[in-house]
Amino acid sequence: MASSVISSAAVATRTNVAQASMVAPFNGLKSAVSFPVSSKQNLDITSIASNGGRVQCMQVWPPYGKKKYETLSYLPDLTDEQLLKEIEYLLNKGWVPCLEFETEHGFVYREYHASPRYYDGRYWTMWKLPMFGCTDATQVLGELQEAKKAYPNAWIRIIGFDNVRQVQCISFIAYKPPGF
């Protein structure tokens, strides 16, 4: 046992001396020529664009004449297929879908006070009841079509409610009135 302690101490002393001379100075990035080339050409956007290319593709949200409403509101209007995917996502998470609509202001506004209050555009009218037990995204889309027919000039959003934690987990605009 004593011999193993002595040998490990000797090894530790030897590696400390060797490590100091093994570190090479940094000489910058290596050229791409020295790396092996794979036979598979990966042509997705993440492999083609460099970091600088991605920065040049970014755009700034125009602040004039456009309002930001909810999650995904900066994107073009979602198609029915895209809405179905979003609804399926919230159903797969076990959340309860619910529709809400607003006929006057689809965005947060201050009417009675400069600081946030109860009546400042964050509370919308619920369409019917939350869809407890719903497992089919097309049912939610059908309710959206009914709400659009009943209120064609209203903003309609879909929320996902977690009834265990009692919180709203997802909310996105599903329909905007014409002209918005």
Swiss-Prot record:
It comes from the Eukaryota. It is found in: Plastid, Chloroplast. Its main location: plastid. GO terms for molecular function: ribulose-bisphosphate carboxylase activity. The keyword Signal does not apply. Heterohexadecamer of 8 large and 8 small subunits. The basic functional RuBisCO is composed of a large chain homodimer in a 'head-to-tail' conformation. In form I RuBisCO this homodimer is arranged in a barrel-like tetramer with the small subunits forming a tetrameric 'cap' on each end of the 'barrel'. This is Ribulose bisphosphate carboxylase small subunit, chloroplastic 1.
